[in-house]
Amino acid sequence: MPTFSRVSTGVEGLDEILNFLQMGDNVVMQVDDIEAYKSFVLPYVRTALAAHRRVVYMRFSHHEALLKNTGQITVYKLNANAGFESFSTQVHNIIRQEGRDVFYVFDCLSDLLLAWATDLMVGNFFVITCPYLFELNTVAYFALLRGRHSFKTVARIRDTTQVLLDVYNYQDKVCVHPLK
């Protein structure tokens, strides 16, 4: 079970809004583009590494890599085109192998639509993966591209995750609206 110790996002203002993250949190960001997601991923990873945490990057998308495979970051390259069951099994095996207290970054979940051609499976993947990450006391970042998913899929993800953030630009400023 999670220990609920406080964890920084690496962004001071976001830490204030959320009163920090806790071990066990899964954080989903609804964004307009990958760059918006990356702007939150990089400080999260820097802060985790500075605290001597293990960082694992689950790479499965066609977008530019969010993180580079340095000696400090473990990168797993996964094949989403192998199908939902194979992909989910790969991810769960990695999570089990990595163990507790790991800080994860996942590529954008919306890109799984390209491989699986169904929104339902994206929601299913999240619903079976998020509780497993929670059990192992991890912190994990995920992204969804705004407007790419059905209301039902977003609702299932919202119901499962611990933190859901709507990230958008307004008058050349990045705004974050916590939805959960």
Protein language model annotation of sequence segments:
Residues 37, 63-68, 149-151:
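Short, charged/polar "capping" segments at the starts of alpha-helices
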Residues 115-116, 121-148:
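Substrate-engagement module of ASCE P-loop NTPases
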Residues 28, 103-107, 141:
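Structural motif
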Residues 51-114:
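Conserved inter-motif catalytic segment of the P-loop NTP-binding fold
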Residues 27, 56-58, 74-76, 141, ...:
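Hydrophobic/aromatic beta-strand patches that form the interior of the parallel beta-sheet core
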Residues 19-22, 47-51, 95-98, 131-136, ...:
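Conserved catalytic network of the ASCE P-loop NTPase/AAA+ motor domain
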Residues 6-62:
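Glycine-rich P-loop/Walker A and Walker A-like loops and their local beta1-loop-alpha1 context
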Residues 138, 144-180:
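Phosphate-binding/switch region of NTP-binding enzymes
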